[in-house]
Regions:
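Catalytic core of carbohydrate-active enzymes
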Residues: 1-203
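A short amphipathic beta-strand at an alpha->beta junction
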Residues: 204-213
Length: 213
């Protein structure tokens, strides 16, 4: 009833949600594990930064995502204050820190990913029952250590209580011109996808050599 333009924008937002379902599901798992809120005030990232306490619009989602929603009409550029460290703008892969401005496009909800994060993303699909053939891991450069979690199970039933789940812990480390990505896995569940792509974001130099074990 709002016209094709707005229908398409709503469709894009819904499809983005489905692409980020691995992050959403893992955020729910972390909440059941230790009570971590899935959506948090920015002060959770650094309680000692007084500027973060003043931010009312933006919020943290899951382990490593910061969302800066557009809540006013006709906004073309939006100011954002980021917690300490580098954060990558998802749509461009550009790193930023502190106070900055981003260009606002109607079909791109502004959000950032923390440096060192491993962000699991599904391909575009229309419903949760659709077969998922591959998973993409967006790996964000950081000079230092970081960890990320990906939790998966059948999505229904109680078999996860007897070990039928998959928990992957990703550990990244950038140091002296090298970068390592390690994975530890727990649980007996095997996800349906057979292919995993790795997409490197923000690396300061061209990758000259890659070693897989």
């Amino acid at each position: 009833s709002f016209g094709d333009k707005w229908t398409d924008l709503a469709k894009n937002a819904i499809e983005l949600r489905y692409c980020l379902l691995p992050c959403l599901y893992s955020a729910f798992w972390l909440h059941t594990l230790d009570g971590s809120p899935m959506i948090r005030h920015l002060a959770f990232a650094d309680a000692q930064d007084p500027k973060l306490w003043e931010v009312e619009r933006d919020f943290l989602f899951g382990e490593h995502i910061l969302v800066s929603p557009v809540i006013q009409p006709k906004v073309q550029r939006q100011g954002v204050y980021l917690p300490k460290g580098n954060w990558y703008y998802f749509w461009t892969g550009q790193p930023g820190h502190g106070e900055l401005f981003v260009n606002v496009l109607p079909d791109q909800i502004p959000f950032f990913v923390r440096e060192g994060a491993v962000l699991p993303v599904y391909p575009t699909h229309q419903h949760t029952g659709e077969h998922i053939e591959e998973l993409t891991l967006y790996v964000y450069y950081k000079n230092g250590l970081e960890s990320s979690h990906l939790y998966e199970d059948a999505g229904e039933g109680y078999d996860y209580q007897t070990g039928m789940f998959s928990l992957k812990v990703f550990e990244t480390e950038g140091k002296n011109g090298t970068f390592s990505l390690r994975q530890r896995k727990e649980g007996a569940y095997t996800p349906e996808y057979k292919k995993v792509k790795i997409y490197l974001v923000g690396f300061p130099t061209f990758v000259k050599k890659c070693v897989a074990d």
